[in-house]
């Protein structure tokens, strides 16, 4: 339902933000 859609959208948004943030920090040395 609507709740599931909101969770999906939020996860997508957070994933994008996290990727942008990690990308700006550079790759961690393993």
From Swiss-Prot:
<dbReference type="GO" id="GO:0005576">
    <property type="term" value="C:extracellular region"/>
</dbReference>
<keyword id="KW-0929">Antimicrobial</keyword>
<comment type="function">
    <text>Has antimicrobial activity.</text>
</comment>
<keyword id="KW-0964">Secreted</keyword>
<dbReference type="GO" id="GO:0006952">
    <property type="term" value="P:defense response"/>
</dbReference>
<protein>
    <recommendedName>
        <fullName>Dermaseptin-3.2TR</fullName>
    </recommendedName>
</protein>
<comment type="similarity">
    <text>Belongs to the frog skin active peptide (FSAP) family. Dermaseptin subfamily.</text>
</comment>
<keyword id="KW-0878">Amphibian defense peptide</keyword>
């Amino acid at each position: 339902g609507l709740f599931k859609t909101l969770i999906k959208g939020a996860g997508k948004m957070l994933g994008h933000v996290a990727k942008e943030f990690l990308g700006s920090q550079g790759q961690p040395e393993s």
